[in-house]
């Protein structure tokens, strides 16, 4: 809650490994707040988050989380290569089966001539790729994506969608958006953040008008409060 306003309440939900969940809600519905609670950036008034690893249930820690922001945050005084080297050096003990820096660049389709440029000279899409790349290297158990495709051009956005589909195994991926068509295109399951609670919207037919109308009605209802 913020200043006595309850943003999230009574959330009791299970996310399964190997799926991309679309967290759909209006702007201001609390999607980023939920992510910040999961990431421990915001302290919850009550409740806990748990994860099952190797058959053992335990509380989620910051080490479990990879967080891709809608506005990429990168150290602009470093080159792309320096940034990756720095990240890999400080996380050396936790990175499983590391590749070479150039292999990672190839994986993200970052051209050789761009790899030694300062990050401040990267486009928004390239900064977003770098932010995504460090989360790929870290291999988190839970990947949170806070509207990361909203301001990307069509080509980069499509590359990122294909990448997310290829990475979804062995982790929980939660993709927040207020754009319904994007959620339907990318995600395996749709979860509606509505009145501060999470609700699964059944996807019996992704193209059905009834399905879309149900989501729109719920979002409109929340907006009229």
Residues of each region from the PLM?
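The feature captures the beta-strand-to-loop junction immediately N-terminal to the Walker
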Residues: 24-26
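Helix-to-loop junction immediately C-terminal to a conserved catalytic motif
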Residues: 39
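Helix N-cap at the start of a conserved alpha-helix in ABC-type nucleotide-binding domains
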Residues: 154-156
